């Protein structure tokens, strides 16, 4: 019951507050106020839980309160009640199924948007496509030696999705990034070898040359086409030993 277990956080928070302080005898301590405070703490945690599930399950607040009351009065033990255990398991199964369906929908949409974007991009002026399927447009070729996959490059870049959303940008951070070229996604490794130091290039990376069906975190869905604008600031060849 991964989602359900969030409720135990309330108890842990109270324990942490109490154990972190030393209380002297205080005859003015208001137990009713303390009881209410604990109730609001648990209620806040419960509200977060209910809100996080609302797209999938519409809970009945009155029944939630009934359950709380019964548990507090010792009328029910969730650890021993098989009916409640089965209900909690069904909640988790429903949430997992909904999460899977949502992920599949997002991946499908990302693929469709990417396919459409690449088809249109391919028609653009000066756009070329490599044998692997990498699409690119060179703004400036740069000068010097051809970049190798084992070289360390220093670049400024902006990465976008087909819908225009920027998911990462060293330009916005104001801090270039340095890395060995064969340690990144295939599209980058291939794309930067098409220019030299000082070069500027835009490349469009199909999912199979990027993060594929896995995606990358919350910002890059599975099956995403990636658009990068890159400027090569410096190139350091791998030293020969």
UniProtKB/Swiss-Prot annotation:
SUPFAM superfamilies: FKBP-like (SSF54534). InterPro entries: PPIase_dom_sf (IPR046357), PPIase_FKBP_dom (IPR001179), PPIase_FKBP_N (IPR000774), PPIase_FKBP_N_sf (IPR036944). Its EC number is 5.2.1.8. It catalyses: [protein]-peptidylproline (omega=180) = [protein]-peptidylproline (omega=0). One of its GO terms (molecular function) is peptidyl-prolyl cis-trans isomerase activity. Keywords: Isomerase, Rotamase. Residues 150-241 form the PPIase FKBP-type domain. GO terms for biological process: protein folding. PPIases accelerate the folding of proteins. It catalyzes the cis-trans isomerization of proline imidic peptide bonds in oligopeptides. Belongs to the FKBP-type PPIase family. This is Probable FKBP-type peptidyl-prolyl cis-trans isomerase. It comes from Haemophilus influenzae (strain ATCC 51907 / DSM 11121 / KW20 / Rd).
